Amino acid sequence: MTPAPRADIRHHDHIVLLVDTFYGKVRNDDLLGAIFNGIIGDRWPEHLEKMHRFWGTVLINEGSYTGTPLRPHLDMPIGAAHFGRWLQLFHATVDELFEGPVAQLAHRNADRMADMFQERIERYRTRPQDFIQ
């Protein structure tokens, strides 16, 4: 029996499923869980709602996110291993739930965002006086 094809990411319910499933994995991850849970604490509902808006804006043009996503991450105790694990979990979640052009866009955007965050966090740590978000 052939498995049913997965849908592409098309509407807000898909964004909620992606974000909630992904962050469920992050919260329970041996490497990432303590960091995220320690910083977010009991504010997970608010964080998830913000991530729904962020990924909804990035992937399906909802236009509901405003903010600067890099700023909250600058002082987090994270490095290459953390970004690598974040990407593993994100890509696995996308692939478990979806397939299609927007799912591929999610992969590309996550890769670009992780690369940019790592580069800017490193610049901020080594030369904060020169840092421009």
Outline where the language-model segments fall:
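Core of compact, soluble alpha-helical bundle domains
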Residues: 1-133
